Amino acid sequence: KLWRKNIVGIVILIASDERIEKFRHPVPTEKKVKKSVMVVLGARKYGLIVSLTRIVHFGKLPEDLKRKHFAVCKVDTALISSTKKGKTIGEVFSEGIKTYRITGYPDEWQKHHQGGPTGYMTRYYRATKKINEIIKENYAFAWNPSITGTKSEDTIITNEENQIIITEDKNWPLLRIETEKGEFLRPDILIK
C-alpha cells in the first residue's frame, strides 16, 4: 500500500510476542505471530520522513501490558506536550525522564533512545538532556519512548502555539491522556 501512494518504507521493523520484550528496534524474522505484533515504520515521501509505531494484540490484553502501555503513552504525551517553540530539546527530554519516574518505570529510558528531531533523516540526532538547541516553529520531531514490551511513537511538527501530530490515525484506537496542558490522544494497542 505504501508504494501505491509513493511512500517509501526506509525503516520497517517488526516483532511478535516475546521478541517485542527483547528488541526495541526489532529486525524482522520469520517468527509467526501468536498473540502480539509491533510494527515500527519510518517512511519517506517528497524527501521528508515520518516515524510511527503501532501494536496489535490478539485476544484479551494482559493487565501488565495495559498498564505499561498507558505509562509509555504518558511519557510520550509529556514529550509531545513539552515540544514547544522556545524550549530546549534538553528541557523536553528531561520532562520525559521525569514522567518515566512518575509512572513507576524510572530506568526504562536508559534501555533505548527517546527519539529527537526528524525531517530529511529518521533522526538528525538522539535527544539528551544536555542538548541546548532551542525549538523553533515548524520543527519536526519523532519521540519514541518505550517500556519493556511496548512503545509509543508518532511524528509531530511544532507550530506557533503547540504541536501537530502528523501521523495520527483517527481510525486507530486512541488513549486519552489528560495533562495540565489539555487532553492528548495517543495510539492504544489494537485488540483483534
Descriptions of predicted regions:
Residues 1-192:
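Active-site neighborhoods and metal-handling regions in enzymes and metal-associated proteins
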